Amino acid sequence: MAAAKRRVRDAEADLNLPPGFRFHPTDEELVAHYLCPRAAGRAAPVPIIAELDLYRHDPWDLPHRALFGRREWYFFTPRDRKYPNGSRPNRAAASGYWKATGADKPVLHNGRTAGIKKALVFYHGKPPRGVKTEWIMHEYRLAKKGGAAAAAGAGALRLDDWVLCRLYNKKNEWEKMQSRKEEEEAMAAAQSWGETRTPESEVVDSDAFPEMDYSLPAASFDDALLPKEEARDDDWLMGMSLDDLQGLGSLLQADDLSMLAPPPAAKTEPLGAPFF
């Protein structure tokens, strides 16, 4: 599928057309501007029609071999005789056969018949019990034979050097099938990618084991290292002004000044002394 898309992109790049243009030639344009030059050995105006032996392939394999197109595909192909001395073409394919339907239609160019258009339907299986499919082909051949096949005459298997074929699926089943195939491939790729990942059950969740913060706040840490001054009993005097101290002194008698002195140290008993 990727190769087919790449060929389409290459052909579109060679065409160098503005966005929005599509290749939808008429019957007359196909015969006059593509089939006639190719049968005469001249190059086609644009390289968007692949050359292959179409009758060696099943129709659903041909879109991958086309150079251009998404819903209809164009091919140049030789055509062989079914029998060496007959004029009937060999319509056998890889796993089935093409069966003509309806009458031949002339393709006019400048008021003259330049080619013949034939419609064919693909049957899967062997004739006459093949199963009809939705694959349709329009085959264009020149009204006047020429080239090496005509020169070979009777007895040669080659009936036409080149005919031009337009292939499409009546119900567009091929495009739907390709869309389903791409979806399945995408799902398979996603599943394969998922299998290569580490199962979530084996993934250690770092959030389940948060790192412990052993650091202390800066202020608390500094306070813990610095020695602390013990509170003194006369610290309350340090906060008083001179006027307050003078006023306090005038109120107190000399014998009461002892209250301003610090209390006597507590008498301590030596360790091990008996308790009475």
UniProtKB/Swiss-Prot annotation:
Tissue distribution of the protein: Expressed in leaf blades.
Pfam family, one: NAM
Induction cue: Induced by salt and cold stresses. Induced by dehydration and methyl jasmonate.
Matches recorded under InterPro entries: NAC-dom, NAC_dom_sf
GO cellular component, as recorded: nucleus
Matching PROSITE patterns: NAC
Major localization listed first in the record, in broad terms: nucleus
Domain NAC: 17-170
Intracellular or extracellular location(s): Nucleus
Molecular-function GO terms, alphabetical: DNA binding
Alphabetized UniProt keyword annotations: DNA-binding, Nucleus, Transcription, Transcription regulation
Biological process terms in GO annotation: regulation of DNA-templated transcription
Recorded domain comment: The NAC domain includes a DNA binding domain and a dimerization domain.
UniProt function note: Probable transcription factor involved in stress response.
Matches recorded under PANTHER family: NAC DOMAIN-CONTAINING PROTEIN 67 (PTHR31719:SF80), NAC TRANSCRIPTION FACTOR 56 (PTHR31719)
Protein name: NAC domain-containing protein 67
Species this protein is from: Oryza sativa subsp. japonica
Source species taxonomy: Eukaryota, Viridiplantae, Streptophyta, Embryophyta, Tracheophyta
